[in-house]
C-alpha cells in the first residue's frame, strides 16, 4: 500500500510491467477508511495508492494510470465534483466509485454527473462502507479480469 506523506515530492510516472498488477487509486481524508479500501483491493491483487488531497490525487492519477478510482466526495479543501470534472477532462478510462457520508441522493447525483461527463461509474457507497458493499460495487469486468470475487 502506498501512502504519500505530506508534503509530497514530485511524482514520477509508475510504469506498469506487462502483466503487472492492476492499480486502484483512492482519495479519502479519513485514513482508516482509505486503509480499509486499500487492504481489500490488495487482497484481490491490486496495487493500491492512497491520496489525501486533491493535489496529490491529480498528480498520482497522471503518474499511475489507474484501473479503478475510489473517490470520497467530501474533502477538506476540495470536493468530489471538482475531481469528477478533472477525470473527465483527462479522458479517464478507469472505473470510478464515489463514496461519502453524504445522503444517498447526493451520491446518486454524483454518479449521474460522472456518467453525463462520460466516466465509467460504479456504486455509489455511503459511509460507513462495509466490505461486502465494497465488493458488490466493484463487480464487473475488473473483478472478472483480476480473478477475485468482487474485485
Where is each model-derived feature located?
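Active-site residues of response regulator receiver
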Residues: 72
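Conserved sequence signature across two-component system core domains
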Residues: 24-28, 51, 69
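Alpha4 helix (beta4-alpha4-beta5 surface) of REC/receiver domains from two-component response regulators
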Residues: 82-85, 102-123
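Acidic catalytic/metal-coordinating carboxylates
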Residues: 52-53, 79-85
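Short acidic/polar segment at the start of the alpha1 helix of CheY-like receiver
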Residues: 30-34, 106
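Non-catalytic signal-transmission and effector/linker regions of two-component phosphorelay proteins
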Residues: 1-25, 31, 38, 130-151
Amino acid at each position: 500500500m502506498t501512502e504519500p506523506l505530506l508534503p509530497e515530492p514530485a511524482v514520477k510516472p509508475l510504469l506498469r510491467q506487462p502483466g503487472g498488477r492492476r492499480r486502484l487509486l483512492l482519495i479519502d481524508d479519513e485514513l482508516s477508511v482509505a486503509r480499509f479500501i486499500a487492504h481489500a483491493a490488495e487482497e484481490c491483487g491490486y496495487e493500491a495508492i492512497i491520496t489525501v488531497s486533491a493535489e496529490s490525487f491529480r498528480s498520482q492519477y497522471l503518474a499511475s494510470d489507474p484501473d479503478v478510482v475510489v473517490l470520497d466526495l467530501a474533502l477538506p479543501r476540495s470536493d468530489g465534483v471538482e475531481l469528477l470534472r478533472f477525470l473527465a477532462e483527462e479522458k479517464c478510462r478507469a472505473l470510478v466509485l464515489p463514496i461519502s457520508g453524504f445522503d444517498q441522493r447526493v451520491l446518486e447525483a454524483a454518479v449521474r454527473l460522472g456518467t453525463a461527463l462520460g466516466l465509467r461509474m460504479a456504486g455509489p457507497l455511503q459511509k460507513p462502507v462495509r466490505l461486502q458493499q465494497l465488493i458488490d460495487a466493484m463487480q464487473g469486468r475488473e473483478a472478472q479480469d483480476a480473478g477475485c470475487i468482487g474485485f
